Each structure stands twice: as C-alpha cells, then as structure tokens.
Amino acid sequence: NGEGLYRFTVDAKTGALRDKTLVSSLPNVAQLTVSRDGKTLYAASEVEKGVVQAWRIEKNGELTALNQVASGGAGPVYLSLTPDGKHLLVANYVSGSIAVLPVQEDGSLAEAVDRHQDEGPAGAERPAAAVEGSFAISDHNGPHAHMIAADPSGKYVYSTDLGLDRIYQYRLDSASGKLTPNDPPFIAASSPGAGPRHFVFTPQGDGL
C-alpha cells in the first residue's frame, strides 16, 4: 500500500539495497514476476478492477512501460509464466477467479483468452488441524484464488483456493491458452479449514 512500484540497486557484496526509485504509481502492487530471459517485468495491482502491467527491463535496469491489461478479476495476488513463456497466469483473490493472458512477441500482454470462476461451499472458519489454543482463522467467506502455476511440462495448471479449501487442476492448451478442468476438477485440502495458499513442484516435476 505504498506509492507504487520501486526499483533498487543491489550491492553484490553486502546485499544492501540502495538508490530507491519510484518507477510507477501502480496502486497496491501485490505480485511481480520476470520473464525467463530477464527482459520483461510483470506487476499485478491488487485493486477491485484488477490490472497487470508489463515493463521492458533495459540493460541499465531502467523500466520502459509496454502496456496494461485487465487481470480478469478483482484483487490479483499471484502471477506466473508458463514454461514456454507464451502465457501469464493470474490468480485473482477477491473475485476468486483465475485468468490466462497471452504474452506478445515484444513482451506486452493481450487481453485474457480464458477465465475460470471458482465455485463451491466456503471452507471451515477455523482450521481443523490447528493446535489446541490456537487463534488461527482463515478467510473462508467464499472463493479466494491464492496461487496459480503450470507444472514443469507446461501441460497442466494448478491453482489454490484458500476460501474453498481446494486445489484446482486443469489441462493447458499451449497454443490457445485455454484451460480444461481435469478429472477430478479439484482436490480437497488435507483437512477442513487448511486454506491452501502456495505449492512447489519436485525437481523431477512428478510431485506437488
């Protein structure tokens, strides 16, 4: 909730950050991701009418704005690129939806080619696995997409929904960017109220 997107210079010896510079007044920047070749930066603005901005990273570290498109929902909180770099995946927390944005040749973004709305009963307010005396609660008042990413093969896409206690799974058409729900379409969390947020793949890509 600061002024926007900042750039820093990193001291390679000490790790210290310096030369703080405001490069965009994009409100409530919630997530950043960089293309595999390091030439493009993507930033999500977690606002009601969510947007994603694309920036070209110049050799001197300066950013050049490419464009801005709708995130496909409200409150985008997570961005990730497919392994081939052709699509940007977006998780919209407030609306509980996910979207697929095509990446153009110059790194700019096109409007969403696919969007899916999470639906289902809200999960338990308190985690069933919480230790005795815990005050832990989760945002289980409806769907809240929290993370989205493709597996290392680029054939499948997974997304977590904190509010519904689910991990959704899709088949990805890498040419069109369309997502098709797998069978089953989702996996329930390990226990009620667990509120899945993030995941990682094994190095071999055969586990999550």
Q: PLM ranges: what are they?
A:
Residues 28-30, 75, 144, 195:
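Beta-rich catalytic cores
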Residues 36-38, 83-84, 152-153, 203-205:
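Residue-level detector of Asp-centered blade-edge/turn motifs that repeat once per structural unit
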Residues 9-15, 55-62, 100-110, 170-179:
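Short loop/turn segments immediately following beta-strands, especially the blade-tip
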Residues 1, 46-47, 93, 103, ...:
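Short loop/turn segments immediately following the C-termini of beta-strands
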Residues 62-147:
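Asp-box/WD-like beta-propeller blade repeats and closely related beta-sheet repeat scaffolds
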Residues 5, 49-52, 96-99, 165-167:
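Structural signal for beta-propeller blades
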